Swiss-Prot record:
Coiled coil region boundaries: none
Gene3D superfamilies linked to this entry: GHMP Kinase, N-terminal domain (3.30.230.70)
Keywords for the protein's UniProt record, in alphabetical order: Cytoplasm, Exosome
Alphabetized NCBIfam families for the sequence: PRK04282.1-1
GO MF assignments: mRNA 3'-UTR AU-rich region binding
SUPFAM superfamilies referenced in this protein's UniProt entry, alphabetically: Ribonuclease PH domain 2-like (SSF55666), Ribosomal protein S5 domain 2-like (SSF54211)
Name of the protein described by the UniProt record: Exosome complex component Rrp42
GO cellular component, one term: cytoplasmic exosome (RNase complex)
Localization per Swiss-Prot or TrEMBL: Cytoplasm
Length: 274
């Protein structure tokens, strides 16, 4: 296991930070993009043959793999007629210069929580269809592995999870001779998802008074603020301010900017899942 050093222990040189800030003030970025431009996105599914569903997403140099494992378990007490979703995230030791060997830290936990919240509240997966007889339910375990962190992990991890769920095959529920409910892993069916409700997370960074999409790792070390919106169709299903502060007008501007970024990511997702 590995964890990421807290923001206070990550650093960027003063000169590099000032270069990033000065360029953004003129609506340019150190990698040549404008504030509204995202890096090239690549989505591949079925990349982990031992998983029930999987996908990898590369956004620029940021690289995340998501694997789905299906099991049987007890539903949550407050949702006895629904399936269960569990999301875990791990940053591999070589993913970043600031990754330390150890248990998942607050960032990895937050990453998993944001992804979980977006999927759980959008209707992409109908969890009521995942309840099975005998008081049991399907359990969908999503394991996220950060292969390389060059910024904007939340957006990339979310996209990888959504694509992996679309790729997931559910083992059929059967009863053995003793009447015990179990999974037949030799007989599977696609996990039903509604692609029109796919949750898309879009993070907006703020440096000075400039808002921009898809921050790189260096830009993240220079941020004054960051807010993430998760959209399903034209609705906001989750919002998370992970750094700094935003005025009301900045939140409105960030929302409009995030909507434009959402359209590009959703188009890439649909193209990859055809």
């Amino acid at each position: 296991m590995a964890s990421i050093s807290p923001y206070g222990k990550r650093f960027i040189s003063y000169l590099r930070r000032e270069q990033i800030r000065r360029l953004l003030a003129t609506k340019y970025r150190v990698d040549g993009r404008g504030p509204e431009q995202t890096r090239n996105v690549e989505i591949n599914v079925g990349v982990v043959k031992t998983a029930d569903g999987s996908a990898e997403v590369k956004l620029g140099k940021t690289h995340v793999v998501a694997g789905v494992k299906v099991g049987l378990g007890q539903p949550f007490p407050d949702a006895p007629d629904e399936g269960v979703l569990v999301v875990n995230a791990e940053v591999l030791p070589h993913a970043s210069p600031y990754t330390e060997v150890g248990p998942p830290d607050e960032f990895a936990i937050e990453l998993a929580r944001v992804v979980d919240r977006g999927i759980r509240h959008c209707g992409y997966v109908d969890f009521k269809k995942l309840a099975v007889e005998g008081g049991k339910a399907y359990v969908l375990w999503i394991d996220l592995y950060v292969i390389n962190d060059d910024g904007n992990l939340i957006d990339v991890a979310n996209l990888a999870s959504v694509a992996a769920l679309k790729n997931t095959q559910l083992p059929v529920v059967v009863k053995d001779e003793a009447g015990v409910v179990k999974l037949d892993r030799n007989n599977k069916a696609p996990l039903p998802v509604d692609i029109s409700k796919a949750p898309i997370a879009v993070s907006v960074g703020k440096i000075g008074n400039v808002l921009f999409l898809d921050p790189t790792f260096e830009e993240e070390l220079s941020l004054d603020g960051r807010i993430t919106f998760t959209f399903s169709e034209d609705k906001i299903v989750a919002a998370q301010k992970t750094l700094g502060y935003f005025t009301q007008s900045e939140i409105e501007a960030a929302l409009n900017l995030a909507l434009r970024g959402r359209d590009r990511l959703l188009e890439a997702l649909k193209s990859a899942l055809k």
